[in-house]
Amino acid sequence: MKQMFYPGMEEIYDKYMETPTWGGMFHACEFETSLMLAVKPETVHMERAVQEYPVRPTTYGMDNTSIGELSVSGTYGNPVPATEEKGEMMLEQFTENISAVIEECVK
């Protein structure tokens, strides 16, 4: 199951992403890469994009294994289908969702 951390994140992910997460986590995957293409495209090198879903040890999170020890490429997922357009659409949806949460809080 995906562990989501923004209001409406699961629905946004399901709507825009073509690839699964790495056990609910994101790093250099379609999701993060799309967001970076939207906000700071000069930092993204799509020619280096590779799919990698490293084996996740059953003790991950309960021992001292760092996320950096598990992936050869640094990728956890598949950044290849990432686009600036997806990132922009997700950012727009995040903004709408968090605005609704803030409006509820100030009522």
List each model region and its residues.
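Extended, histidine- and acidic-residue-enriched regions that form the cofactor-binding/catalytic faces
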Residues: 1-107
